[in-house]
Amino acid sequence: MAAALLARACGPVRGALWPRDCRRLHTIFQSVELPETYQMLRQTCRDFAEKELVPIAAQVDKEHRFPEAQVKKMGELGLMAMDVPEELSGAGLDYLAYTIAMEEISRGCASTGVIMSVNNFLYLGPILKFGSKEQKQQWITPFTSGDKVGCFALSEPGNGSDAGAAATTAQADHDSWVLSGTKAWITNAWEASAAVVFASTDRSLQNKGISAFLVPMPTAGLTLGKKEDKLGIRASSTANLIFEDCRIPKENLLGEPGMGFKIAMKTLDMGRIGIASKALGISQAALDCAVNYAENRRAFGVPLTKLQGIQFKLADMALALESARLLTWRAAMLKDNKKNPFIKEPAMAKLAASEAATAITHQAIQILGGMGYVTEMPAERHYRDARITEIYEGTSEIQRLVIAGHLLKSYRS
C-alpha cells in the first residue's frame, strides 16, 4: 500500500520485530542509540527530504506555494498517515517513528513539515480516536495518500488560547447541524478537502457545551478568508473559515455532543509532539547551516570554527538541540506505552524544542553575519519558520501553565 517504501526501510511495520525494538528503545536513558529499524526510517526520510524538499524549500516559501507534488510523494511513502492502521490505508507506525520522520521532513522544509503534522494528528488523529467505523472509512482513508489533506478548526478571532470560549455555534435542525461563526488561523485551509470543526452546541455549559464536527470542503455556507501573509511557514496556507448557516448531516458529529473540548485537548497533546519534532528539524537545519558556513569562512587567517567565541555558540546550539530531542523522543515513547494522563510530557517537549529552535536559528544568523540576513542562505528562512513553533498548538506560556499545574498536583497528592 502507500507505506511500501517505509516498509522496505523498516522491515515489518507491525509484528514481532517492531514492538521488540520499541521495548529496547524504552530504555533510552541507558542507551540513546536508535534501533536499526528507526535508523533506516530516519535515513529514508532524510534522503527524501534532501532530494525532494531542500531544492524547492526556498522557492515555495518565496511564492507562498503549496508543495503539491511533494505532498503526494509523501503520501506514497506513508508519511501523511503514519499512525493510521494499515486497514485504513495508513502506515501503521508508532509515535516515535512519526517523531523521527517529522524532524527529517521539517529539516528539509518546515512548511511541508507543518502540512504533514496537521494532516497526521490534528485532522486524522481525532477521527481515528473518536470516530465511528463509518466515519473512519469516509474521513480517514481518502486522506492517507497525499491527494487530499485535512485541517483542524479550533481557534477563533477572539479566543486565542482560551479554546473553551468558542463563539461558533452548531444548532440541531431535524437531520442536520447548522454551523455559524468564524474560525481563525487554520493551517491547510486553502488546500483542505475536510475540516474537524469545534462549535458550541450549548453556550450555557461553556467548554462542556462544545462539540466536534466533520465538515467537507468546499461546502455551501462555508467560505475561506484571505490567505494570510505570514512571517514564516509560507508554503502552508493559513486562513479563516467563515460559516454562515452551513448545513451538514447529523451523522457528521464526531463523538458525542459536549465532547468537543475533550477531543480538542487530547488532539493538541498529540499534535504538540509533532510541533516539537518540527522545531527539532528547523534547529538541525540551522545548526547544519551554521557549521558548514563557519568551517569554510575564514577570519583573522583561520576558519571561524577555530575561534573560541564561535565554538561556544555551536556548543550551546548543539546542547539545546540534543536536550530538546531527548524530551521529544521521551514524550513519543510514553505515548506509545499508553501513559495516562499524557499531558505534561508533550508540553515539556514542545516548550523545550520550540524555544531551542528560536535560540538556535538566532545564533545561526549571528554566526553567518551579513550572509545570515539575506535570502541567498537558508538561515533567515529557518529563523522565520522557527518563531511560530512557540505560538501555535499552545503558546509557550500555556505550556508553562500546563507543566506547573501537573508539577504542583504531584507535590500535593
Curated annotation (Swiss-Prot):
GO terms for molecular function: acyl-CoA dehydrogenase activity; flavin adenine dinucleotide binding; short-chain fatty acyl-CoA dehydrogenase activity. The active site is at E393. The keyword Metal-binding does not apply. GO terms for biological process: butyrate catabolic process; fatty acid beta-oxidation using acyl-CoA dehydrogenase. Binds 1 FAD per subunit. Its EC number is 1.3.8.1. One of its GO terms (cellular component) is mitochondrial matrix. Short-chain specific acyl-CoA dehydrogenase is one of the acyl-CoA dehydrogenases that catalyze the first step of mitochondrial fatty acid beta-oxidation, an aerobic process breaking down fatty acids into acetyl-CoA and allowing the production of energy from fats. Homotetramer. This is Short-chain specific acyl-CoA dehydrogenase, mitochondrial. The gene is ACADS.
